[in-house]
């Protein structure tokens, strides 16, 4: 590092931070913000969220005695400043890269990362467990959950708060509100009010009054209503108070001095506390302030430019192809209802949301609700399409079984980010969907090998009377000239190459790698297309003409498509040996998609190597 960061250079841990005089904290915040911008612009990563939490992160580590006190970050997009202050600034340039820093807080990486995260809305539940454990073990540690306003749209967050309000452990929830919808409430009066409400005099008076008035419920109720009326004039915290939390705020999340004062007061309070801060996503970098969504996750870019580099024209992504299919289908069918749990941009639905706003529903981070909401639409004669990432559909699994499949409802699941997603790592890999879908009765499960097949399968699933799923990967297809999607026969595979002895059964978009490997063995190649139902007629023929069946999928081997083939062969006491190639029984680390596939033996060379090893052992 250079003289550009004179204060930050001195900080290798929060203990170093706590040795700084308070007067230098604003200067340190400016250095962290500049360091974050410079580092991420050179390496890519999540930017806007971290820019918005610099002052909060500094104040938390300044007031709380980390790592003894526990900071529990939700999701982790906002935790880059936390990594910088906890001894990882020299490696920040490696974040999200193979063998580099993990993209989110990760327990194996640092003692300051007390909860590994990636999915949203988990922090309050985990922090509550830690707070209860601390009380049971008579520990003096404090526990803080830091959660964004987006994550607060998930029911799990309120389930945890409801429980915390009931059992009342000592804990703090910091609500980082960067939507700016209540920015007019942030000012000098509220700074004074926050200090007042978090101070010992007010809280002692408040708790003492409760005890004094407890035998007099009518008077206590009147006093409570009067208190809420006073606070409600300036603080929109009634819902949190009803859940049993003492609510403080909203305060300016970029005023580090006010944050330190307020957090210092709140650290000494007992029971569940909630501090509501207002921040600006992308704070301090004007392009990110103007376009916080665009600067949420960024490629390498020049900070001196006023915009991110334009994406070079090329082969459309599967997400873009899905979005165009939605628009084309909705143009002729007003019954189509598209649903996403807060993944409009990532799922390719921006244009659809603009052209068909009455047929578009962003239900926020509420995967369970999105699935059952789709069930209700289907019951009423509409045709819902749930666009969801593979890793997030896991969160709506019971609803998929109980509310959709059990009732055999017409719901299409467009499952994006299936297989290896790359830089976001183990919390986001779409590794399990084939396994958890194929065991559900009534489901039709499809995996296209290219973008044209994806269009055909979306059309097929949409027309199908019952629940259907199409899973496709992150990234672009192979560059086919696309025609309109057409309905294909359910459960029918396609034989692409006739060979001898060995048959490769491909499930999904690894087909080019499979074909390259199969050519080395003069093998048959079959694009299976359907995981459920399997093309059993095709399997019957292959079992009589080939001695080795090789299944290839970008899903865990356990319970996946290869398992379905192995089960069928075993049930029929057939002679072919079955080699299943897919993801191993482990959580897949971060790195580029190509790097991860090569490391796991899912490129052409790796597939060829695994087949050769299998034949040698046979």
Curated annotation (Swiss-Prot):
Catalytic reaction equation(s): D-glyceraldehyde 3-phosphate + pyruvate + H(+) = 1-deoxy-D-xylulose 5-phosphate + CO2
EC number(s) reported in the record: 2.2.1.7
GO cellular component: cytosol
Binding site for thiamine diphosphate: 77, 118-120, 150-151, 178, 285, 367
SMART domains according to UniProt: Transket_pyr
Region forming the signal peptide: none
Domain of life of the source: Bacteria
The keyword Transit peptide is assigned to this record: no
Pathway membership: Metabolic intermediate biosynthesis; 1-deoxy-D-xylulose 5-phosphate biosynthesis; 1-deoxy-D-xylulose 5-phosphate from D-glyceraldehyde 3-phosphate and pyruvate: step 1/1
Record-linked NCBIfam families: dxs, PRK05444.2-2
Complex and partners: Homodimer.
Protein family: Belongs to the transketolase family. DXPS subfamily.
Protein name, entry field: 1-deoxy-D-xylulose-5-phosphate synthase
């Amino acid at each position: 590092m250079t003289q550009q960061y004179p204060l930050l250079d001195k900080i290798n841990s929060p203990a170093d931070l706590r040795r700084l005089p308070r007067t230098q904290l604003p200067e340190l915040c400016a250095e962290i913000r500049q360091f974050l911008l410079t580092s991420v612009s050179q390496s890519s990563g999540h930017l806007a969220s971290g820019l918005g939490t610099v002052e909060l992160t500094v104040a938390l580590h300044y007031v709380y005695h980390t790592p003894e006190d526990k900071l529990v970050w939700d999701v982790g997009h906002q935790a880059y400043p936390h990594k910088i202050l906890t001894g990882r600034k020299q490696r920040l340039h490696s974040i999200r890269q193979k063998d580099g820093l993990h993209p989110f807080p990760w327990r194996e990486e640092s003692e300051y990362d007390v909860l590994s995260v990636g999915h949203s809305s988990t922090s309050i539940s985990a922090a509550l467990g830690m707070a209860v454990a601390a009380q049971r073990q008579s520990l003096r540690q404090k526990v803080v959950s830091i959660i964004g306003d987006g994550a607060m749209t998930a029911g799990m967050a309120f389930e945890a708060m409801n429980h915390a309000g009931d059992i009342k452990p000592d804990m703090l929830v910091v609500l980082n509100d960067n939507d700016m919808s209540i920015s007019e409430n942030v000012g000098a009066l509220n700074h004074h009010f926050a200090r007042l409400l978090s101070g010992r005099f007010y809280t002692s008076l408040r708790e003492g009054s409760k005890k004094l008035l407890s035998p007099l419920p009518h008077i206590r109720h009147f006093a409570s209503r009067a208190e809420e009326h006073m606070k409600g004039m300036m603080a929109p915290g009634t819902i949190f108070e009803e859940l049993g939390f003492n609510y403080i705020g909203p305060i300016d999340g970029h005023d580090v001095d006010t944050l330190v004062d307020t957090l210092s007061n709140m650290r000494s309070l007992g029971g569940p506390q909630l501090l509501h801060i207002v921040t600006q996503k992308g704070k301090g970098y004007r392009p990110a302030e103007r376009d916080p969504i665009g600067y949420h996750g960024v490629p390498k870019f020049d900070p001196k430019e006023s915009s991110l580099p334009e994406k070079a024209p090329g082969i459309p992504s599967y997400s873009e192809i899905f979005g165009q299919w939605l628009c084309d289908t909705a143009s002729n069918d007003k019954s189509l209802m598209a649903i996403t749990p807060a993944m409009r941009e990532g799922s390719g639905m921006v244009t659809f949301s603009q052209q068909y706003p009455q047929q578009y529903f962003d239900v926020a981070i509420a995967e369970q609700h999105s699935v059952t909401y789709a069930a209700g639409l289907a019951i009423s004669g509409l045709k819902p399409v749930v666009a969801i990432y593979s890793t997030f559909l896991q969160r709506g699994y019971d609803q998929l079984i109980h509310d959709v499949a059990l009732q055999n409802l017409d719901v299409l699941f467009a499952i994006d980010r299936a297989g290896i997603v790359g830089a976001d790592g183990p919390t986001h890999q779409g590794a399990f969907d084939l396994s958890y879908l194929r065991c559900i009765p009534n489901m039709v499960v499809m995996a296209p090998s290219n973008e044209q097949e994806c269009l055909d399968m979306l059309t097929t699933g949409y027309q199908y009377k019952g629940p259907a799923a199409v899973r496709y990967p992150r990234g672009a297809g192979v560059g086919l000239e696309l025609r309109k999607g057409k309905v294909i026969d359910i459960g029918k595979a396609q034989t692409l190459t006739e060979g001898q002895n060995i048959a490769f059964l491909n499930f999904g978009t690894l087909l080019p790698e499979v074909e390259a490997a199969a050519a080395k063995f003069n093998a048959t190649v079959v694009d299976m297309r359907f995981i459920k139902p399997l093309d059993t007629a095709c399997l019957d023929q292959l079992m009589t003409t080939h001695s080795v069946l090789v299944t290839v999928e970008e899903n865990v081997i356990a319970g996946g498509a290869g398992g379905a083939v192995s089960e069928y062969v075993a049930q029929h006491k057939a002679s072919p040996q079955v080699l299943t190639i897919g993801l191993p029984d482990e959580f897949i680390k971060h790195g580029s998609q190509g790097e991860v596939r090569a490391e796991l033996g899912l490129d052409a060379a790796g597939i060829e190597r695994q087949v050769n090893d299998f034949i040698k052992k046979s």
